[in-house]
Amino acid sequence: MRLTEEQEKIIRHTTGHARVSAVAGSGKTTAMIRRVSHLLQQGVAPDKILVLMFNRSAKVVFAERLHQSLQGTTLRPPAVRTFHSLGLRLVASFTNRQYLPRYRLVTEDFQLEKLAREAMKKYGAEANGDETWISKEGIEGFLLFISRVKSDIASPQEVFAACGFEEQHAYYIHAYKVFESLRHAARIRFYHDLIHEPVMAIQAQKDLADWVADHLDYILVDEYQDINEVQQQLLLYIAGQQAQVMVVGDVDQCIYEWRGAQPKYIVSRFARDFSQPTNYTLSYSFRYGHRLALAANHLISNNRLRDRKLCLAWSTNPDTRITCLPEGEVQPLINILQNWQEKRGLNQAAVLVRIYAQAVPVELALLEHNIPYRLVGSETVFSCSEIRALLGYLRLCQGSLKKTGQDVDHVNHVDHINHADMSTVLAMLTHPHLWLKRDVLQSLAQKILKKPGSAGSLIKKYADEAGSPYLTSRILDLAEIWRKIRRKSPKTRAFTVLNTLIEETDLYAHFLNIFRLLIALVLTKGNNSFFEARQND
């Protein structure tokens, strides 16, 4: 593969720190691999080089490509790690030296949410908190606050102020202290503790800082625009005074500010922490044509905190056409794909969405026109719990909530309950959420499937277990809604059933927070016919 002059300069960088600003598709991974190979060929020992990545998949791909590039030589590849795997090694070392307690690592997200909810309930009881503190939105906000604190080295109070949390959520600060107390009592650490704990330990113990520093001669960091404060501190500590640090990134792709990443790190902070770096640019993209590159330059120029690089399309890139189509009743994508199929296969076409919620109307349009597709990285529209819940309410109206048969009083075993039916009812019980424990919800779902006609009465019986007047009222209201939908004629239009559900619950706000396009989708005239067509599926 022929390298560009810009890539060659990076590969043969001589001394000191370096900052590489790379546009999308500019061959930065190739340049980094060749840079590592160049260092090894110059006689640098592999254990004196460290390559840091931000996620495991990127690390695996880089390590495989590096290994392939060294085949046929006697050169041994250096360590390629993620920041978290590096943190894990430090935690193990600090634990053995008794600088950190020996805790169990918990990686399941639901365990983190469970502890956060427990902490919020405990502090809420002490501080007379209201029901919003333990609502889905309240817990999500609290989890975000925990993540921001763990991505920084500042105090919870300082993080709260710096990140612009609303003053009405100041209770997050005190709930965080309860959360940490519960975590230590349970002797567990979560994924984000793998970096936060060793960095805070190094800050508190100078001998630890001396112990971790100056073991490396070269450190290469990929996707540097994603770095946060606690990771920056870790990089500083392991580099010490000896390592030459080269970072590669694109400030225009800094999209993880919600977890502590900020454009300032690659724009100015790197040069402050790692003095007098040599600046390089990878300005040519090999992914797309001139028109798209030009459009991207014009758009991103509105960002203020960035470098002044321009994205240029490589001269041999195929042309990229840009067409802007207004979104109306008919999904414009359908005509595009139908015309595409006349000359090419669908395996040569792809649809990109900014967030997966935006894929919902696209999926429905493709399904309605029998155009096959494959969704990568997320559940398909009829697999996600929000849509399963809506279809479940339609089936409740039809009297077909239990597909495998009618009400059966004598069924007493879980084995007789269809798994798909169980998933549907659980989705209905959590959209809107009854706020009952998971095992209680599963028990209730089983009872409903045994006797769907009595669903409203079965839900009502759990009102006493709600634990607060607000949740009791919520359960009673939902029980009545289930009864109301069940009493409707099986021939009732899908739009009418769903509209009843939306008008009499907070489902609109619920979905707006977690699935912003869903209600617009349900209430769009063009999609009502689709739901009605699917009602009998």
What are these model-derived regions, one by one?
Residues 1-22, 26, 30-31, 48-50, ...:
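Accessory N-terminal region flanking or inserted into the helicase ATPase core
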Residues 1-99, 210, 240, 294-297:
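P-loop NTPase Walker
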Residues 44-48, 69-78, 94-108, 120-134, ...:
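Short, polar/flexible loop-turn hinges at active-site or ligand-entry regions and domain interfaces
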Residues 45-58, 78, 222, 248, ...:
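Conserved RecA-like ASCE P-loop NTPase motor core of nucleic-acid helicases/translocases
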Residues 86, 272, 316-320, 343-491:
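ATPase/helicase motor core of nucleic-acid motors
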Residues 208-209, 408-414, 456-457, 508-537:
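Conserved C-terminal motor-coupling region of P-loop helicases
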Residues 229-326:
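Conserved RecA-like helicase ATPase core segment
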Residues 465-523:
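C-terminal extensions
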